[in-house]
Amino acid sequence: MRKTEMLRIIALKKQTLINKVSFRLTFAEALEIGVKNAPSIIGCVVLWLLTIWVPYINVGTTIAINMLPIELAKGGVISPLGIFDAKYRKYMGDFLITTGLMIIPVFIASLFMIVPGIVLSIAWSLAYFFLFEKKKNPMQAISASNEATYGSKWTMFFVLLAFVVAAYVIAGIFAWICAAIDAGFITFVVMLALVAVIMSISLAINASFWRQLKDNVQ
């Protein structure tokens, strides 16, 4: 039995009526999903950058990038061409409304010593996924995200904090080594690969959050 499956079983045994995020399971799943999908995510980002100037298409691909964790949570390897699927453009209006409904309150909350803004950001971090995957309207999606993350916000915060710190430390070490070698092309390739893996694991963390919490709200 794979380690991630064992961790999932342990996490499930600890769950009661409300599913909660497991620190260990999140990182185990994120590494497994992220490393496996790193090349595909590079392809997604490259295609997104190449088409960001194309009106209408760019909205769909931007939505697709934000929705990648949903596909990653299914456990397979994603296709970079999937960001052009018309289903993403179908949700353009709801996506923009949801974004607007979240940005202003988070900004206002951040004025109160930043912490409330962080709490709201985490509480609403699954809103897009509920909007797209469970067909909620914008207000329902935000409310569902808040309900689904109840009891898990601190764990999610420390997962994200640990990831950011680890990413900065690892990037710093690689940058120092590359600077010592003083080989421009090698530095470029290494740092590009590192950025790709970091981006991939970041999306995979959100995928794990979604996988663990999505059933808290029907």
Regions found by a protein language model. Name each.
Residues 1-2, 9, 22, 160:
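Gram-positive cell-envelope targeting signals
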Residues 3-4, 55:
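Polybasic, lysine-rich low-complexity intrinsically disordered segments
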Residues 4-18:
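Short, contiguous pre-domain boundary segments
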Residues 14-21, 28, 71-74:
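Alpha-helical transmembrane segments and their immediate interhelical/interface regions
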Residues 20-50, 81-108, 120-173, 204-207, ...:
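Interfacial aromatic "cap" segments that immediately flank transmembrane helices
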Residues 48-78, 106-143, 182-217:
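Selective recognition of hydrophobic, aromatic-rich stretches within alpha-helical transmembrane segments
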Residues 173-181:
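Juxtamembrane "helix-exit" motif on the non-cytosolic side of transmembrane helices
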